[in-house]
């Protein structure tokens, strides 16, 4: 097998690697308001985990089953980094108002801090813990492999690799 073939096979293996998700936490009462809390999630500190997926619903009383997804890369933060911690916002939008809640993962990855929920009105943000209610949290393996540049590299190389076998 030539060096070129080996490179092509390695690139294909990298591109085809699918993310794996493992449930770390589930809200026992997603139809109730969700107050701020720090969840202990030792599963985030496991070697190989490179991200976290948070599923939320717009409102604790929603019955339509719609979930909103927030993926947070843990190796290279793409959100704000404040006081050594990565902070991300997720939100769902109603007819007039927007809703949001902060998710903060310290660098030790042993907890996830969840803020109050907020309802944005035309005049100000109003605390509303029945909005953006977390439903489940998953660890992600291979979801952000090699960080942002790994994903960019994969996207750039896909046409080339496909051409290897044409």
Where are each of the predicted segments found?
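Extracellular jelly-roll beta-sandwich "head" domains, especially the C-terminal globular C1q domain
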Residues: 90-166
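Surface-exposed ligand/attachment interfaces on beta-rich extracellular proteins
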Residues: 27-47, 59-69, 76
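Terminal beta-strand-rich extracellular "head" domains
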Residues: 59, 66-69, 73-98
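Trp- and acidic/polar-enriched beta-sheet ligand-binding modules for extracellular glycan
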Residues: 25-33, 55, 85-89, 115
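A short beta-strand element within beta-rich, extracytoplasmic domains
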Residues: 50-58, 112-118
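Glycine-rich, low-complexity segments
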Residues: 6-34, 43-44, 142-157
């Amino acid at each position: 097998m030539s060096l070129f073939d080996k490179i092509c096979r390695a690139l294909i293996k990298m591109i085809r690697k699918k993310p794996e998700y493992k449930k770390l936490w589930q809200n026992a009462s997603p139809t109730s308001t969700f107050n701020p809390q720090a969840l202990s999630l030792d599963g985030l500190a496991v070697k190989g985990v490179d991200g976290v997926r948070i599923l939320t619903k717009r409102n604790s009383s929603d019955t339509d089953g719609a979930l909103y997804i927030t993926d947070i890369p843990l190796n290279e933060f793409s959100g704000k980094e404040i006081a050594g911690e990565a902070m991300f916002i997720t939100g769902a939008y109603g007819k007039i108002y927007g809703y949001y809640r902060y998710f903060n993962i310290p660098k030790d990855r042993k907890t996830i801090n969840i803020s109050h929920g907020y309802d944005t009105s035309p005049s100000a943000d109003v605390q509303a813990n029945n909005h953006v209610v977390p439903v489940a949290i998953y660890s992600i393996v291979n979801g952000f492999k090699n960080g942002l540049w790994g994903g960019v590299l994969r996207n750039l190389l896909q046409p080339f690799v496909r051409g290897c076998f044409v």
